[in-house]
Amino acid sequence: MVSSEQNLFADFQNIVKKNRSCRRFDNSHKIDKKTLRKLIGLARNCASAANMQPLKYIICCDEDKASEIFSCLGWAAYLREWKGPVKKERPGAYIIILGDHNVSDRFWCDHGITAQTMLLGARFMGLGGCMFAAINIKKLKKTLDIAEHLEPKLVLALGKPVEEIQIDEIGKDGDIKYWRDENQVHHVPKRRVEELIVGTFCNI
């Protein structure tokens, strides 16, 4: 790669490393509708199986409605003593990713692709986020008056991060559970690249 390409890759690599699941935010930092629409614009340009584009979105930056969405989510299963962020550290906005059964009954991995893309976009904006699949779907559908043909797939919580997150190499015990130290630094164990590659067929 030429130097400019190397620099671009290094920048992208840095954004990916920063794009951790952030669960504590500065709730005083407001996120407006325009910002959320920009993220939906990124999702619009993502790949979609058979180009069906079956995903729809609900955006929320209203404080009262955000509080209701918050109560529909399961926060950090491995941190059993932690019930989620206190009010001043809650997300400032949410994006709900929905599968539209009027378009297709198969959503494949489209929602994962768009969720990751929007979270990367949020990091470029200086924001952080967390992707939720632990959702009380019945409660969320009632809270947001979601039509029957729309199926909640993921919820993105967004805000200005106040959490320090550190990537660690998985220890000899093989424990993959994230944890927090006495300084509230959030540690995320990751497998080494060598463990991930199970076959190599390269001659250069």
Indicate where each model-derived feature is located.
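Acidic, surface-exposed loops and disordered segments
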Residues: M1-I204
